[in-house]
Amino acid sequence: MASRNPPPQDYESDDESYEVLDLTEYARRHHWWNRVFGHSSGPMVEKYSVATQIVMGGVTGWCAGFLFQKVGKLAATAVGGGFLLLQVASHSGYVQIDWKRVEKDVNKAKRQIKKRANKAAPEINNIIEEATDFIKQNIVISSGFVGGFLLGLAS
């Protein structure tokens, strides 16, 4: 159960005080919580029918795919246009590019990325394992999301 915090003067620091809430008690007192989040906190399989899961996954996947497509087009246009303008300016003599320095900087960046990737490998493996577990537990909504995402990219 949640208990109220003592008055602020009992703390060493008067800056902030926090209250710990017990969500199970909160859900019992607020019935809308149960309507929105359901009675169980398990996988989606326990809460909704297969058709509902497929529709939910498909709609969210389509939205994500559509946005990914639009943002991707915009980013590709900006990068491609910038590169094209840089090439025209270089060819016209407005800009001088030191390609040896560019190559040196790119190689330095590659080495730094490899170092950081090797350090981050355990955390990435953790995230991948959690994502895999989620997908296995919610295979229907996950497959709906993937299908919707691909449809969103295509539209």
From Swiss-Prot:
Residues 1-47, 96-133 are cytoplasmic. The keyword RNA-binding does not apply. The modification Phosphoserine is found at S13, S17. Phosphorylation at Ser-13 by CK2 and at Tyr-18 by SRC inhibits activation of mitophagy. Following hypoxia, dephosphorylated at Tyr-18, leading to interaction with MAP1 LC3 family proteins and triggering mitophagy. Dephosphorylation is mediated by PGAM5. Phosphorylated by ULK1 at Ser-17 which enhances FUNDC1 binding to LC3. Keywords: Autophagy, Isopeptide bond, Membrane, Mitochondrion, Mitochondrion outer membrane, Phosphoprotein, Transmembrane, Transmembrane helix, Ubl conjugation. The chain crosses the membrane at residues 48-68, 75-95, 134-154. It is a multi-pass membrane protein. GO terms for cellular component: mitochondrial outer membrane. Residues 69-74, 155 are mitochondrial intermembrane. There is a cross-link at K119 (Glycyl lysine isopeptide (Lys-Gly) (interchain with G-Cter in ubiquitin)). Interacts (via YXXL motif) with MAP1 LC3 family proteins MAP1LC3A, MAP1LC3B and GABARAP. Interacts with DNM1L/DPR1. Interacts with GPX4. Integral mitochondrial outer-membrane protein that mediates the formation of mitochondria-associated endoplasmic reticulum membranes (MAMs). In turn, mediates angiogenesis and neoangiogenesis through interference with intracellular Ca(2+) communication and regulation of the vascular endothelial growth factor receptor KDR/VEGFR2 expression at both mRNA and protein levels. Also acts as an activator of hypoxia-induced mitophagy, an important mechanism for mitochondrial quality and homeostasis, by interacting with and recruiting LC3 protein family to mitochondria. Belongs to the FUN14 family. This is FUN14 domain-containing protein 1. It comes from Mus musculus (Mouse). The gene is Fundc1.
